Design a protein with these regions (language model features):
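Internal glycine-rich alpha/beta core junctions
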Residues: 1-144
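Short, solvent-exposed helix-loop connector elements
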Residues: 147-153
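Conserved small/polar residues in nucleotide/adenosyl-binding loops
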Residues: 154-161
Length: 161
């Protein structure tokens, strides 16, 4: 189990990295190349509790790395969730009988009434694959995206996928 603790620690680091990467002040970059308004970006950075202002306005509106970083973090975490769910399924099986799942979270079999199906674990294991698809979809969308803002991201995967 301690191996999974280490995996989830790495996942936590990945999500923290995502938060830190987003902690830059975009105020004043406008839709492409900045604004003619006299904005003190260092002042607004301090007031809004950002770590620093973004460095390049075109990169700021064009950047989608944060989406990829987040989706990768979700995918890596999903792998670990899937793996531990599989471990619990195996450990709960009659062959191993190392753990016992509470009757409140298992379902019976229509053919074998004594059988207890670990449906929540199987659901977790199966559902984690959608995060890989979301990451691959976003990689495909972003591969040819030119600089600046484009509506192409509206075709990105739904959070419910």
């Amino acid at each position: 189990m301690m191996a999974y603790v280490e995996m989830f620690k790495r996942d936590k680091k990945r999500f923290k990295y995502n938060l830190n990467a987003l902690n830059e002040n975009p105020l004043g970059v406008a839709a492409l190349s900045g604004t003619s308004f006299n904005i003190d970006r260092n002042f607004t950075t301090k007031k809004l509790n950002f770590s620093k202002p973004t460095d390049n306005s075109i990169d700021t509106v064009s950047d989608r790395d944060f989406v990829l970083d987040f989706l990768y973090a979700c995918s890596a975490c999903s792998i670990h969730i899937s793996r531990i769910a599989e471990e619990f399924i195996i450990w709960n099986s009659d062959a191993y009988n190392l753990i016992h799942l509470n009757d409140k979270i298992v379902t019976g079999s229509s053919i074998m009434p004594q059988r207890k199906n670990p449906d929540p674990l199987e659901y977790l294991r199966g559902k984690t694959g959608s995060s890989f698809g979301n990451l691959f979809s976003m990689l495909t969308i972003l591969k040819g995206l030119p600089l600046s803002y484009f509506c192409l991201l509206y075709t990105s995967p739904s959070p419910r996928d």
